[in-house]
């Protein structure tokens, strides 16, 4: 049994070439059972969304393009996506529009949901241009400390921090809490 994963990519006035890199990386995932919902929210300018709509068509049936107007910022867009999520989905994965995943992302992390007590899996992250300068290398070192030490300690105490991107959530758990909280401008601060 390979769980169906619905990947949600919210975007607000994101540069098309940046979002295109994200979507192309998602098209190369080595996981057979997923969809990608691209949620362009509150962005009326065609410059931002028209090339992405075309790219989603080119990438095939796994990619669903939506251009919506909603309230609640990113969380509102993610909640709207829940209405379009494939009924087979067991896991929701969220990736920001400017992230690039490696092909084994899902195949490596989805098995963690075999434990029915697992509701959230937070993947570590780095800056893709972390080797371009000392400042960016330092930012990656900061991330490494957070993920390699802090998150491991939190996991042992069942007190994980959701970063808002590179996160996977069991859909039934998400629905149990009523979706993403829209009371704050950033959905991962609640």
Which role does the model predict for each range below?
Residues 1-24:
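N-proximal low-complexity "stem/linker" segments adjacent to membrane-targeting elements
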């Amino acid at each position: 049994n390979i769980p169906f994963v619905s990947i949600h990519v919210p975007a607000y006035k994101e540069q098309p070439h940046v979002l295109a890199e994200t979507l192309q990386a998602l098209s190369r995932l080595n996981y057979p059972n997923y969809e990608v919902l691209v949620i362009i929210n509150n962005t009326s300018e065609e410059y931002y969304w028209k090339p992405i709509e075309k790219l989603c068509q080119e990438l095939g049936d796994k990619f669903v393009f939506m251009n919506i107007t909603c309230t609640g910022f990113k969380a509102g867009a993610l909640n709207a996506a829940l209405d379009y999520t494939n009924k087979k989905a067991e896991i929701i994965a969220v990736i920001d529009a400017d992230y690039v995943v490696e092909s084994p992302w899902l195949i490596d992390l989805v098995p963690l949901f075999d434990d029915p007590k697992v509701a959230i899996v937070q993947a570590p992250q780095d800056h893709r241009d972390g080797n371009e300068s000392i400042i960016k290398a330092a930012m990656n070192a900061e991330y490494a400390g957070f993920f390699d030490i802090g998150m491991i300690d939190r996991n042992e105490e069942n007190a994980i921090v959701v970063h808002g991107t590179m996160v996977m959530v069991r859909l039934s758990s998400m629905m149990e809490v009523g979706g993403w909280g829209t009371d704050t401008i950033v959905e991962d601060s609640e």
